[in-house]
């Protein structure tokens, strides 16, 4: 099933798991991946809770799942680019993350979160949503084999749900990405990466 050139991640909140589409259509839902809508999969992967309507998917067994933004469970699935046969990669693959460092509060990342504070204790809600959106990926990014191929772009100045950023903000974010990529590639060593993280057993 890994022959597809586009793979998106979604959070199936009905079954409580991260799903990679189209890879998991058959395994999780018993559906033929070639018969499923690409547009629906992409829309599900961006269905941020409280802001966009979830996507519903009915399995071959008749069970309907609710699909939301895959970032709820994994916002940086760079391992989707890896080979699955255990062999060393033939070329490098890089990930670019726009996740900010964990802020003191959620307002920097989700400026409209104040509307939802009334649902419970503000500090607890802040901590829970911050950890859900950022914390898990921060821990993942700190793994040496992930960090070694990750270009980190500081996006703290742009909120997670800023849909109407100005031209100046776009230019500033572009410049940060450009500078981060240049700095990363200046020190990138493909052979060293293979030795450290992708060495294989010559007899295997």
Regions found by a protein language model. Give the residues of each.
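Patatin-like phospholipase
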Residues: 1-204
């Amino acid at each position: 099933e890994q022959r597809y050139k586009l793979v998106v991640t979604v959070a199936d909140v009905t079954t409580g798991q991260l799903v990679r589409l189209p890879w998991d259509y058959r395994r999780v839902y018993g559906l033929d991946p070639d018969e499923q809508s690409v547009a629906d999969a992409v829309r599900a992967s961006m269905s941020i809770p409280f802001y966009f309507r979830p996507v519903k998917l009915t399995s071959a067994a008749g069970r309907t799942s609710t699909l939301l933004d895959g970032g709820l469970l994994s916002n940086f699935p760079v391992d989707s680019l890896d080979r699955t046969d255990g062999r060393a990669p033939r070329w490098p693959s890089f990930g670019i993350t726009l996740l900010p460092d964990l802020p003191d509060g959620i307002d920097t990342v989700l400026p409209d979160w104040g509307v939802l504070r009334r649902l419970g204790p503000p500090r607890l809600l802040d901590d829970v949503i911050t950890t859900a959106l950022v914390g898990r990926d921060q821990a993942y990014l700190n793994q040496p084999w992930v960090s070694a191929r990750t270009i980190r772009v500081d996006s703290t100045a742009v909120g997670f749900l800023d849909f109407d950023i100005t031209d100046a903000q776009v230019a500033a974010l572009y410049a940060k990405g450009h500078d981060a990529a240049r700095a990363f590639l200046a020190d990138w060593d493909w052979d060293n990466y293979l030795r450290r993280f992708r060495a294989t057993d010559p007899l295997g």
